[in-house]
Design a protein with these regions (language model features):
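Short hydrophobic alpha-helical segments used for membrane anchoring or interfacial signaling
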Residues: 89-94
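Extracytoplasmic/periplasmic proteins that interact with beta-lactams or build/remodel peptidoglycan
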Residues: 1-88, 103, 108-137, 141
């Protein structure tokens, strides 16, 4: 506890040299885990010699909590990331949202904050490194890319414009606005439906679906799935809500321009349809959305 923290926390029974949870589960459940100090009040004479005990208050240990983490799965997740520059892995039970593993790379020694002495080099590496090891990448927002296509697919299905038996012609390129939006294999996949489009991750199939239903339908479905909002995970103090664009967002200035001067463009919907540019989501949000597909249609809280 720092000096400034002590001024506030001392009212709750903390001492100046106490250790407290700084991040993650230990931060979220600090009140449950911490317990309370005990002590003995004694009477002494003028020179400090013990005379008698006036009372004893026993200390109380904090309560235990049981995590849903599966240690074996957690170890595998961390091993997979070990030789990677950066990334995140989340393993979630789609039936109830239980987190079985969550890993982020780069990471740091969680015992660092409890040390009395913190070497300057280690401190600088932790707080000022370009790799940002303090960021939990499982809870930070990024362009999702092709994993977003399932959202566009649901928007097409729910709109009624692109029912389950829809077949669309894919091609090397489709022009929206002034830009050619390419298929990732530069050839196309012929006439395909949803299942094959997801299997081969066709860009031009989902360009057509997204452009057909429009940005606001994709946005509507994304909100049902839990995007652009906190996932509900207990360690949400570290969580980014991300960004899912819609027509109101574009009309209001996109967060950087003047209202009315940043209209929605055809290029925007093409990019949005495959999870690029105007879509930023977190890995935990993606896991939550895919759980809906896996469990038959209901939203769970991680």
């Amino acid at each position: 506890i720092t000096e400034s923290e002590y001024e506030i926390l001392s009212n709750d029974g903390y001492r100046f040299d106490d250790l407290i949870g700084r991040t993650g589960i230990e931060y979220a459940y600090e009140d449950i885990l911490r317990g309370s100090w005990g002590g003995e009040m004694i009477e002494v004479d003028a020179v400090g010699n013990f005379q008698r005990s006036l009372g004893v208050k026993p200390s109380q240990k904090g309560d235990d909590i049981q995590l849903t983490i599966d240690l074996d799965i957690q170890k595998v997740a961390e091993e997979v990331l070990e030789d990677k520059i950066g990334g995140a892995i989340i393993v979630m039970d789609p039936r109830d949202g239980a987190i079985l593993a969550i890993a982020s790379k780069p990471t740091f020694d969680l015992n660092f904050f409890s040390r009395d002495f913190k070497p300057e080099e280690e401190y600088n590496d932790l707080f000022f490194s370009d790799s940002k090891p303090l960021f939990n990448r499982a809870l930070n927002a990024y362009d999702p890319g092709s994993v977003w296509k399932i959202v566009t697919a649901l928007a097409g299905l729910e709109s009624g414009q692109f029912p389950a038996n829809t077949l669309l012609e894919t091609s090397p390129c489709i022009i929206y606005g002034s830009q050619c939006f390419r298929e990732h294999n530069d050839l196309g996949f012929g006439i395909i439906g949803y299942e094959d489009a997801l299997r081969v991750s066709s860009n031009t199939f989902f360009y057509q679906v997204g452009y057909g239903v429009g940005v606001d339908k994709i946005y509507e479905i994304s909100q049902i799935l839990g995007f652009s909002q906190l996932s509900g995970i207990e360690i949400s103090d570290q969580e980014d809500v991300g960004l899912i664009a819609n027509s109101d967002w574009a009309q209001s200035g996109r967060g950087w321009g003047n209202p009315g001067e940043t209209p929605w463009l055809p290029e925007d919907i093409a990019s949005m349809s495959i999870g690029q540019f105007v879509v930023q989501v977190t890995p935990i949000q993606i896991a939550k959305a895919y759980a809906v597909i896996a469990n038959g249609g209901y939203v769970v809280t991680p």
